[in-house]
């Protein structure tokens, strides 16, 4: 089963910008015995690593950039078949948007069950799938994980300057002596 949370997004003055919705799978209903701890636990950057990155960045006059990866979990593919039953309100929305009619005959008790293709907030394995997806991508663009903290990545730029990136779920902090490298990462 899933839930939908809707909240107002406001600017720094408190002025309404837009509504933000988040679908959350009912991971508490997943059978945890099907997964090993290493399939569900995702590392997060250590506070000491963040302090070290900031301290080093300041002492070396590096440039800083922080970022948020929008809808991060949806970038990771589900590895197993995970079924999710939509509540009646979400089923109604799905049917209204389903121009091909593929879900019309699959409704039971005003609900439809779907297969998740992408990781979704709330699934017990989603955080780990997202971390693996992101760390694999960072390796393809030249970053190496730090041996002490798996959420800190480093690479040398084409100008032989170091860029350091720290990840906490879908938030990141990047520092580099090479401002062009920060621009490339955007």
Please identify what each model-predicted range represents.
Residues 1-186:
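Long, low-complexity, charge-biased intrinsically disordered regions
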């Amino acid at each position: 089963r899933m839930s939908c949370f809707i909240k107002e997004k406001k600017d720094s003055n408190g002025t309404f910008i837009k509504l933000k919705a988040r679908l959350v799978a009912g991971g508490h209903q997943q059978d945890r015995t099907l997964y090993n701890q290493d399939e569900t636990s995702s590392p997060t950057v250590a506070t000491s690593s963040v302090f070290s990155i900031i301290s080093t960045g300041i002492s070396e006059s590096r440039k800083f950039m922080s970022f948020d990866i929008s809808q991060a979990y949806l970038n990771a593919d589900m590895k197993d078949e995970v079924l999710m039953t939509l509540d009646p309100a979400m089923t109604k929305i799905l049917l209204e948007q389903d121009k091909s009619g593929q879900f019309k005959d699959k409704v039971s008790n005003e609900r439809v069950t779907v297969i998740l293709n992408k990781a979704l907030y709330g699934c017990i394995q989603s955080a780990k799938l997202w971390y693996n997806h992101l760390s694999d991508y960072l390796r393809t663009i030249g970053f190496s994980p730090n041996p002490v903290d798996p959420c800190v990545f480093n690479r040398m730029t084409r100008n032989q300057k170091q860029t350091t990136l720290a990840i906490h779920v879908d938030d990141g902090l990047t520092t580099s002596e090479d401002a062009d490298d920060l621009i490339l990462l955007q």
